[in-house]
Swiss-Prot record:
Family: Belongs to the prokaryotic/mitochondrial release factor family.
Protein name: Peptide chain release factor 1
PROSITE patterns per the UniProt record, alphabetical: RF_PROK_I
Residue spans of biased composition, Basic and acidic residues class: 284-293
Keyword Cytoplasm carried by entry: yes
């Protein structure tokens, strides 16, 4: 490992001890925002420090094994230990490089998840419902909280569009690669001839950010319309115009919210989603400029970018970005998404490492 990387790891080890001491100080404990920020930093540094300590121990073990080579009785065992130790050190160095990659500050935040029916009519809306259920089950398995912000029901089930806020640790970091086009191939329940239909939905994942970090929105740039809500899931039909539609005139972004009975609450929710959308568009533009010379697994921001196909007759799901095919569709639709998400995360990290190597 390069001396510069070892020096950086030693500095982080010192910072880990420093943060540990700070977390025990009464002034820090009394300041909840600072305490949370330091706790997050401590958790990240703990992973790096633990891995670095394992690497240091492996290096010491290698030196001990090399000294044993001079002893004829111990030589065979020493050679075996050196071989195993070399593999261990290489694996730890790879892990440390990943841990040292620049962190996306949004990764630890919650997110807004949008699922929208695309081509395919009723079947697309039904599939949008299936996708939302899939993400909800995944969130449940991670002990995240899902709150529906707005939902427009499909005529025969599912959703024309559903927006939810998902809260918890590391939500955005896990779900941000889900943005893009999701295609389904299956025989609809209404199909009497048994023909396979192809439908599509689009998914957008945007980081939830504190109000202080949201972009400044000029009230003059907003057109706010009220309309009568059909209520969440078609229930509790309102007799007042409590639903809100906000249009951001400079960008054309439109957000609707009708989940609450209170117009004030719907407006607050819609504004938070609008702010997240505007910020996401700005971040996406910057990422595209930075990654213009290499592929961007986060997608182009174009909802029509197809990232995944779900083929029900074959029980197959394919991620087109990394050419990954799994025959575990039933498990995936039940929310077991790590087998799809983790390979994309790893590929993204490999791309980051390659980009850093090019810079060096």
């Amino acid at each position: 490992m390069k001396p510069s990387i070892v020096a950086k790891l030693e500095a982080l080890q010192e910072r880990h001890e420093e943060v540990q001491a700070l977390l025990g100080e009464p002034s820090v404990i009394a300041d909840m925002d600072r305490f949370r920020a330091l706790s997050r930093e401590y958790a990240q540094l703990t992973d790096i420090t633990r891995c670095f300590q394992q690497w240091q121990q492996a290096q010491e073990d290698q030196q001990t094994a090399e000294m044993m080579l001079d002893d004829p009785e111990m030589r065979d065992m020493a050679q075996e230990e050196l071989k195993e130790g070399k593999a261990t050190i290489e694996a730890l160095e790879q892990q440390l490089q990943v841990l040292l990659l620049p962190k996306d500050p949004d990764d630890e935040r919650g997110c807004f998840l949008e699922v929208r029916a695309g081509t395919g009519g009723d079947e697309a809306a039904i599939f949008a419902g299936d996708l939302f259920r899939m993400y909800s089950r995944y969130a449940e398995s991670r002990r995240w909280r899902v709150e529906v912000m707005s939902a427009s029901d499909g005529e025969h089930g599912g959703y024309k569009e559903v927006i939810a806020k998902i809260s918890g640790d590391g939500v955005y970091g896990q779900l941000k690669f889900e943005s893009g086009g999701h295609r389904v191939q299956r025989v609809p329940a209404t199909e009497s001839q048994g023909r396979i239909h192809t439908s599509a939905c689009t998914v957008a994942v945007m980081a939830e950010v504190p109000e202080a970090e949201l972009p400044d929105i000029n009230p003059a740039d907003l057109r706010i319309d009220t309309f009568r809500s059909s209520g969440a899931g078609g229930q509790h039909v309102n007799t007042t115009d409590s639903a809100i539609r906000i249009t951001h005139l400079p960008t054309g972004i439109v957000v609707e919210c009708q989940d609450e009975r209170s117009q004030h609450k719907n407006k607050a929710k819609a504004l938070s989603v609008l702010g997240a959308r505007i910020r996401a568009a700005e971040v996406q533009k910057r990422q595209q400029e930075e990654a213009s010379t290499r592929r961007n697994l986060l997608g182009s921001g174009d909802r029509s970018d197809r990232i995944r196909t779900y083929n029900f007759p074959q029980g197959r799901v394919t991620d087109h970005r990394i050419n990954l095919t799994l025959y575990r569709l039933d498990e995936v639709m039940e929310g077991k998404l790590d087998t799809l998400i983790q390979p994309v995360v790893q590929e993204y990290q490999a791309d980051q490492l390659a980009a850093l190597s090019e810079q060096e």
